[in-house]
């Protein structure tokens, strides 16, 4: 079954709020080699003007993965997860993510295209804090390999 082109423009319900934990930020920072003290030490983060440790710039993939999982669970996508590879990732920030943030993400499928027999699905996950203020938007492109790939 090919990827459903009518996915383009679909907005999924907001994912459950995600509480950014200090230890989760530290674990992620260590995993990606982000050694700056603001990622690991609350005092260093406070000295730099932040309320708590600052998540590395790619940390929002944790929450975005939850929204993409919602998309893949939709019965009419035509996306065979066994044929999916990650194509591209980008982030647009309003402010840094810090421990203690409670973020809610809403996914919008912004583009469905075919290139070289493969489907390309681009999705934006807009993340807001508990007050509803925008924090970051994560944009990713999933490549769904075609039958000949």
UniProtKB/Swiss-Prot annotation:
Residues 16-117 form the MaoC-like domain. GO terms for biological process: fatty acid biosynthetic process. Transmembrane segments: none annotated. It comes from the Bacteria. SUPFAM superfamilies: Thioesterase/thiol ester dehydrase-isomerase (SSF54637). One of its GO terms (molecular function) is (3R)-hydroxyacyl-[acyl-carrier-protein] dehydratase activity. Gene3D superfamilies: Hotdog Thioesterase (3.10.129.10). Disulfide bonds: none annotated. Belongs to the UPF0336 family. HAMAP family: UPF0336. This is UPF0336 protein CMM_2793.
